Amino acid sequence: MASQNRILVLGPTGAIGRHVVWASIKAGNPTYALIRKTPGDINKPSLVAAANPESKEELLQSFKAAGVILLEGDMNDHEALVKAIKQVDTVICTFGRLLILDQVKIIKAIKEAGNVKRFFPSEFGLDVDRHDAVDPVRPVFDEKASIRRVVEAEGVPYTYLCCHAFTGYFLRNLAQFDATEPPRDKVIILGDGNVKGAYVTEADVGTYTIRAANDPRTLNKAVHIRLPHNYLTSNEVVSLWEKKIGKTLEKSYISEEKVLKDINVSTFPHNYLLALYHSQQIKGDAVYEIDPAKDAEAYDLYPDVKYTTADEYLDQFV
């Protein structure tokens, strides 16, 4: 039962981690959050801010009030990490791209603790074993894939959560740079706009993650979040928006050659985001067939989940 599955979230105050924590609490799981003893690097470059107004301190107070058990520790304190892990059944890591390789320390602690029934390494993007991405995102995907291989080699029970495109990255501005909401006059579309992409809200990522964590069917499998109403081409997304505002946008289609050139001359975060857009909107890295022996579709597993559709998500910007 969900109430018996104790869940530890690593990276609990991040853009995705906080949603995993709230989903765990909502599902009735005893929920633990590992809080660093020392502050993180406030000067590290940020890709996208969490879509929540709370400061870290406010969020932690909200967690405590909701019954989350806060544990102190970090990746460089092996004893504290093992102690935290021994208290739970499932470990969910939501680290950002700069900390992917630090997960080898988590795996080492999980092996020593000897009690973990499931580990979710920090994935929360496309399937890193199925992609055609370019730099600067390719090295991050390669690091995530290398962590998969360590997990498998060490015999750690796992679930890989492949959620593809967060609405906060791709949908809130129709993938337009330096915009915080969808355009009302002109829109830039990468490629021909006819490649399917998969969109999901960060809150729904939390929901599906916890459903998978409580589900024996997802053991040692990759769970893919490609929701029927959110599996859309760029042209379909733009059309949804045009219908809402009652206006046809002026469209500029950018060739792959131009996109690759722009990636090479841009700096962070533009080059990184543009490479993500290229991966989904041009290369079609959300378009593939799954292998039922090692994969599962989240929608097929949990058709009862009322997820936010792309159409509903865009309503807030009208």
From Swiss-Prot:
InterPro entries: NAD(P)-bd_dom_sf (IPR036291), NmrA-like (IPR008030), NmrA-type/Isoflavone_red_sf (IPR050608), PCBER-like (IPR045312). Its EC number is 1.3.1.45. Keywords: NADP, Oxidoreductase. NADP(+) binds at G11, P12, T13, G14, A15, I16, G17, R36, K44, R148. CDD domains: PCBER_SDR_a. The keyword NADP applies. The keyword Oxidoreductase applies. It catalyses: (3R)-vestitone + NADP(+) = 2'-hydroxyformononetin + NADPH + 2 H(+). It is an enzyme of class 1 (oxidoreductase). Belongs to the NmrA-type oxidoreductase family. Isoflavone reductase subfamily. This is Isoflavone reductase. It comes from Cicer arietinum (Chickpea).
